[in-house]
Amino acid sequence: LAERGLDVRVYCAFQFTDPLPDEIVEQARDDGVASLIALPVYPLCGPSTTIAAFAALRDALERAEWDVPVQEISGWHPHPAYVRLRASGIVETASRAGVSLADPRVALVFSAHGTPVKYLQEGSRYDRYVQENCAAVAAAAECERYVIGYQNHTNRPLEWTQPDIESVIASIDADHVVVVPISFMHEQSETLAELDHELREEAEARGLAFHRVPVPYDDPAFASLLADLCEPFVDAPSGTATRPHGVAGRPIPNTQLAYRACLCRGQPGTVCLNGQR
């Protein structure tokens, strides 16, 4: 955003580790911020991720007794730069491994964060977002064959999205498996431990060569697409968020897309790239 001539303060808050939203809210208020843009770094909108992040911010604002305009930006996985970014990671990983995605003995597997089925029954479209995002990324990587598995927290007594990633790996008839952590935009225990160690062990026990695609959290293209998402709501050169309500229809820089009202959030002023469907 700074490279685009916009004077914007950027803060990073986490849901489960420091700095938590309460700390960032206090800091932003002390800095004299007049309005906020809330952008969860979850490409695929879900109730326990994106929607929960908005709720955490709203709760922090309420505890701070700070009545500040907030523009919420929800699911953004259709952004073409994001699709290209994930596809390029797949192609590069396959190239480094010396395998071809066109080879029938090479399997492309998307590993998505699982969600309780009850959320889908209540109207969440998370599984649909996963399916369409994987289809778009696979097409951009010019790979016609792929499968999707979910990383589920089976220690909780709930019905989860299926198939789980372990079952997918157990069913693959191939020599190589290229695994894409499609729901994740940073490396953490669910990629570094669950995939790189636990799933790798299961794959190698079945004779599969395991190749994991890195999460492109530090790629400049990722920072650029986040700037694309925020720029329509920043008033240059003041750097303040503009009109936090009634913004549906605004075009997004460097794309053919425009914002629509978020159907998952269902709150005035929340926009996303999924609402038109």
Q: Predicted segment positions?
A:
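Extended amphipathic ligand-handling, pore-lining, and cofactor/metal-binding catalytic surfaces
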Residues: 1-277
